[in-house]
Amino acid sequence: SNADMKIAQEVSYLNMALEQVEQLNIQIATTQAKGGSSLASLDQRQAILDKIGSIVPINVVPRDNGAVAIYTEGGASLLDISAVTIGFEKQNTVTAHQTLEANTLSGLTLNGQDVLRSTALGGGSLGGYFEVRDVYGVQAQEQLDALSRDLIERFSDPALDTTRAAGDPGLFTDANASFDPINEVGLSSRLTLNSAVDTAAGGDVWKLRDGLGATTPGAVGDATLLNDLRGALEESRMPASGNFGTGALAAADLFSSFSGLLAVS
C-alpha cells in the first residue's frame, strides 16, 4: 500500500539523517576543540534535526564540545554518540488479509529490537502513516467488505429470481461463486457481476430481465424482475456486518454512510 511505502521511505531517511548527525557531531566537536568556527556545520545539523523532528517528535540534548544526543518524546534513544538503526520491512503489495495485528505487516525495530511504535516512535508523519495503514486502512477495508457483502446478499434471495438453481449465486458474486460469510475479508476485491449477465464473460444482458437461469429470452416488455431487483436495492435492511449504526438502511444509504466515514477518517 501507499502508506507502507511511505513508512519505508521515512525510515530510510531517518537512518540516513541520524548517520549524518553522528558525523556532524564529530566534525563540530573536532572543529571546536581546535578553536575553529563550526557555524556551517551547526546550521546543517539543525536543518537535519528539524526534518527528523517532523517525522518523529524528538528531544535534542546537548553533549560536550557541541555534540548532541537525540531522543524521541517517547524516550527512545536515536543517537547518543552512535546512531541507532531503525528497522522496517516493506511489503511490495499489501492485501486485505495483512495487518500488523496478525503479524503479517512490519512494525519497527531499533538496533534489531522490537519497539512499541506508538510509544517509542509515536507522533509526527511516521506515526501518521502507521495510523493510515494499521487503523484507518483496516477500518475502511472492513467497511468496504461489509458493503460488498450487503450487495451480494440483497440479490441472493432465491425468491427474487426463481430461474436460479439452488445454491447458485445471485446478481453479484464472490469471484463468480456463491458467497460464504466466513470469507468476508477481502470480499470487495473479489466482488464480480454474475457471468450470466456479463457480456465480457459471454453472458447475456437479457437475463437481467428474464432471470439468471433463463435459457431463452422472454417478453421484452416484462419488467417484473427488473422492478424486483430495484426493490432489493431500495429495501431497508440491517447490514450483516460493518459499522453503519443500528438502523435499517437501503443500499444507497449504506454507500452514503461509507463515504461519510471516509471523510471523517
Cite the ranges covered by each PLM segment.
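Structural signature of extracellular appendage/secretion-system components
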Residues: 1-265
